[in-house]
């Protein structure tokens, strides 16, 4: 019988954890990165590795930055090969996963929902 929920395997979770540690280390040191990322504090919110371990989707959120979303994406994509090489040196696998960066809209969506709830005329129907 097929599972209805998709769960990550132990290998996917382990690889995502290693990639997260490596990305944090690289972002702290600032080595091998595009110069635009030096003064751009980023948070890696989550990493999702595909079932075949070939692709790692890395979600990030910038804090207090002067750079636009497109500039950050361009800088991360310019540094992608150096980051992948650094990850390759840390893992013991036949293939190193391709790194893809995505902006995490979770924080923006939470702020929008909070504003909608504050500004709405939502009333508890049980109190009427």
UniProtKB/Swiss-Prot annotation:
Transmembrane spans: none
Key words of the record: Cytoplasm, Ribosome biogenesis
A Pfam family this chain is assigned to: RBFA
One Gene Ontology cellular component annotation held by this UniProt entry: cytosol
InterPro entries in the record: KH_dom-like_a/b (IPR015946), RbfA (IPR000238), RbfA_dom_sf (IPR023799), Ribosome-bd_factorA_CS (IPR020053)
Gene3D superfamilies in the cross-refs: 3.30.300.20
SUPFAM superfamilies for the chain: Ribosome-binding factor A, RbfA
Localisation: Cytoplasm
Domain of life: Bacteria
GO biological process, one term: maturation of SSU-rRNA
Main localization (coarse): cytoplasm
Functional description taken from the UniProt entry: One of several proteins that assist in the late maturation steps of the functional core of the 30S ribosomal subunit. Associates with free 30S ribosomal subunits (but not with 30S subunits that are part of 70S ribosomes or polysomes). Required for efficient processing of 16S rRNA. May interact with the 5'-terminal helix region of 16S rRNA.
Annotated family: Belongs to the RbfA family.
Record-linked NCBIfam families: PRK00521.2-2, rbfA
Subunit structure: Monomer. Binds 30S ribosomal subunits, but not 50S ribosomal subunits or 70S ribosomes.
Name listed for the protein in its UniProt record: Ribosome-binding factor A
Source organism of the structure: Rickettsia prowazekii (strain Madrid E)
């Amino acid at each position: 019988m097929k599972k209805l929920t998709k769960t990550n395997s132990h290998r996917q979770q382990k690889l995502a954890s290693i990639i997260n540690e490596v990305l944090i280390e690289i972002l702290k040191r600032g080595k091998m990165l595009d110069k635009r990322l030096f003064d751009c504090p980023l948070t890696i919110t989550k990493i999702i590795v595909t079932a075949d371990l070939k692709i790692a989707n890395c979600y990030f959120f910038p804090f207090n930055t002067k750079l636009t979303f497109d500039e950050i994406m361009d800088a991360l994509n310019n540094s992608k090969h150096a980051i992948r090489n650094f990850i390759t040196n840390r893992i013991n696998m036949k293939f190193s996963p391709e790194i893809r960066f995505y902006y995490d809209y979770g924080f923006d969506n939470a702020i929008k929902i909070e504003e909608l709830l504050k500004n709405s005329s939502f009333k508890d129907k049980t109190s009427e």
